[in-house]
Each structure stands twice: as C-alpha cells, then as structure tokens.
Amino acid sequence: IVVAYNKEPLFRLIQKEEIMTENDLKTHSELYPNRNFGNNLWKASGLSSLFTIEDARSMAKLPYLKHLHGIAEITMSPEYGGMLKTPSNNCANHYTWWHTTLFDLNNAEIQYREITLQPKAI
C-alpha cells in the first residue's frame, strides 16, 4: 500500500455527470453490509479508482457500470489516504483507494470529465 501521491490525478466513476456526492464515496462493504466478502473484505472496504482517463472511459462501457454517468478527476494529496494497485481482468490500471476522513468533497480539487468525448461539429 502506498500513500496517495501528491498532486497526481486519480479517476473515479460517479453516479452523476458533474457532481461527486457522499454516495460516490461509499464502499461495497458499506453498500452491501450483509454480503460475505470473505478474503476480499480488504478490497470491498476501499474505492475502485483508475489511473488514467482512458481507463475510466473504457470501464464506463462495461454493462455492470452503466448506472455511472460521470468521471471525477481527483487531485490526490497524501492525507487523502492509501491506495494499492489492484489490476482486474477489465483494467490493468485499477487501484483500490482507502480514503481518510481528511478527504473532504467540499475542499478537494475535483474536475469533472465526460465519459464519452462528443465529436466536434464541422
């Protein structure tokens, strides 16, 4: 596990296009408290995050993630917690992020990105 890198971006798929809410910070263990995660409880207690915008856009195309409509680009800071590279079959640049209570949506530097780039009109 490494401390979140200072000023490095981390991308997270979010429910709405242009706003990250407290609901976007809920882990699987919080969303599904009665589920038995077994040996994966450590991963279920963190947030799925991605290292590049391209990875975020690619993951957003997966059927089980279609309910997510935006991408938050979070400028990370060491006090935001720890993260670990946890590659999956769908993404080699998948990270699990365990945020601290110092991560504050109202004060964090967050930019919002479109899931799909719209072609420019000619």
Give residue spans per PLM region.
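Conserved NAD+-utilizing ADP-ribose enzyme module
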Residues: I1-L47, F51-I122
